[in-house]
Amino acid sequence: MKGSNTFRWAIAIGVVVAAAAFWFWHSRSESPTAAPGVAAQAPHTAAAGRRGMRDGPLAPVQAATATTQAVPRYLSGLGTVTAANTVTVRSRVDGQLIALHFQEGQQVNAGDLLAQIDPSQFKVALAQAQGQLAKDNATLANARRDLARYQQLAKTNLVSRQELDAQQALVNETQGTIKADEANVASAQLQLDWSRITAPVSGRVGLKQVDVGNQISSSDTAGIVVITQTHPIDLIFTLPESDIATVVQAQKAGKTLVVEAWDRTNSHKLSEGVLLSLDNQIDPTTGTIKIKARFTNQDDTLFPNQFVNARMLVDTEQNAVVVPAAAVQMGNEGHFVWVLNDENNVSKMRVKIGIQDNQNVVISAGLSAGDRVVTDGIDRLTEGAKVEVVEPQTTMADEKSPSRHEGQKGARA
């Protein structure tokens, strides 16, 4: 049994050794033909790569020409719309509110009737004052007649000088009483007039603060309604203290500074007004000063407490060199642009910028009118490289075509 097992192991080992020897001989016989093929392929690939780099397409870019323009200079700040006047309408007399003569949100004019207090008690008080005045006027008339008689009798010594003086004093006293009566009549008339509550200013009324039937008094703080004057309307915004000198100089030069109100996103112009005044002190916590501008607001585009972006035109720079904002780049050395020569070679040019907005930038130094600058395709540029200047629509087609050709090559492969 032991001898048969040893024989089987010897056969298995022999088979394995024979298989290994066959594989080694077969691999050695194929390697001399495969190696030359690989070696021949490598030079071909390298040559193809060099040929592709040498014959590759030029980098497509878009370009614009520097021009001269009259560029406005704006000072910008954040602001809030405020009513030119805000008035809380209160009653000046105590009484029962019997009528409201306005609709909430209505535009009213100064002097329009807004509310009515029950006038009954004030009419009674006026009638009493008028009655007392009439009574004292009759007393004065009688005293004056007696004084005239006393004066005639005094000439014949039928009355004493003392009696004449006493009658004169009575006349004077009655005249004083009448003056007081006239004041009482005027006061009663005023109380009656005040029972009719009118609009002190023109503007838009808000929501009513009290309903008809309530007893109101002059001490009520909430009042009856609030009127906000929106024609005209004001805008209060802030500017850095470094801009104060510019604004003051423009005012001293007699310029009317135009202020534009833009919406919250700064994308839509709402209205246009003029500078009204500057505050008399700087806020030490923010280093800013408050500016007030006034707008006619006839179209009601501005509303009290509305948040807006303010832009104030302070000057206009004439013959300024202007390029699109997309052409100006920022690097370690500062602002620069890529300039194109007549042969469409690009070179980096350092520039000094001035006034700028979302679309254009004023170049204070480094460029002249007529220079061509790259506005798109900048990330593919190197110093001295030759480029292909294309139109915007051409650039879009060129950007799509390589991917399409690559897809076709991949399909064939």
Swiss-Prot record:
Task: Indicate the principal place this protein occupies in or around the cell.
Answer: membrane
Give start-end of the signal peptide: 1-20
Location in the cell reads: Cell inner membrane
The record's keywords, sorted A to Z, are:
Cell inner membrane, Cell membrane, Membrane, Repeat, Signal, Transport
Membrane-topology annotation of the record = Peripheral membrane protein
Q: Which GO terms describe its molecular function?
A: efflux transmembrane transporter activity
Q: Where is region (Disordered) located? A: 31-57, 392-413
The Gene Ontology CC terms held by the record are:
efflux pump complex; plasma membrane
Task: Locate the compositionally biased regions of type Basic and acidic residues.
Answer: 397-413
Q: How does it assemble?
A: Part of a tripartite efflux system composed of MdtA, MdtB and MdtC.
Q: Do you know which PANTHER family this protein is assigned to? A: MULTIDRUG RESISTANCE PROTEIN MDTA
Q: Which family does it belong to?
A: Belongs to the membrane fusion protein (MFP) (TC 8.A.1) family.
Supply the name of the protein. Multidrug resistance protein MdtA
Q: Which organism is it from?
A: Salmonella heidelberg (strain SL476)
